[in-house]
Amino acid sequence: MADQLSLRLEADQLPDLPDLRPMMARPLPAPFDSDEHLFEPWWGGARALVYVGPADLAGAGDVRVRDATGQEIAAAFPELAGLAVRIAARSAILDGELVVVDGSGRADPVALAGRLAGEPGRPAAFLAFDVLHLDGRSMLSQPLIRRREALRRILRPGDEVVAVPAIATEGVALYAAAVAQGIAGIVARQRSSPYLPGVKSRLWRFVAATPAGGTTLAGGATSDVPPDVLPEADGPAAAPVLALISRLPFDED
């Protein structure tokens, strides 16, 4: 009983999670290689911040999902309600993209747009790439590589959430793979970059995938691209998110 009371007091003493807005990337016309950057796929999903509050004695934590404008959208994605059990922390704010994956393991922007509008459909997943707040401590001033280390440490992947891996240096190769796999593009983030809430910064750049035909592959929802763009999703009930990620040649950062 004493241990349970201690756990409750420890959770109650945590500060309220801050109200943040996503840091945004600026566009570039072409991919590049750089030892100073980490490169990730731009899935074309809906940008979102996931807030995970302290777990109660039953192990269930408060989960809130907010879009890039700060609007609460958790009600549209009940499948994310149990996400707290996959976070090995008392509280956290994660940044990432919501996607819906089709049967071929590709992101489906139309299906995601339907889910955002409250329509029933295939389950969504949250592809996390950053952690902004952890166990009552701000992570905003920490460099990206430290925040990503923390993210990988606390997140246990599952059908509804996964930490997106990155590749070091080889942005051109990742871009070529993204184009070949029909993925929306890539994002380059400076390894040393702090997190600047609500800022569109040159510390982060995105390159939309353009196949030989000349039109971009991104299409229809909202992300950190103009004006907050699209998803890549859809997929079998098994583990569509992991299948999506496995299409690309990642080295751990």
Please state what every model-predicted region is.
Residues 1-253:
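Catalytic cores of nucleic-acid ligases and guanylyltransferases
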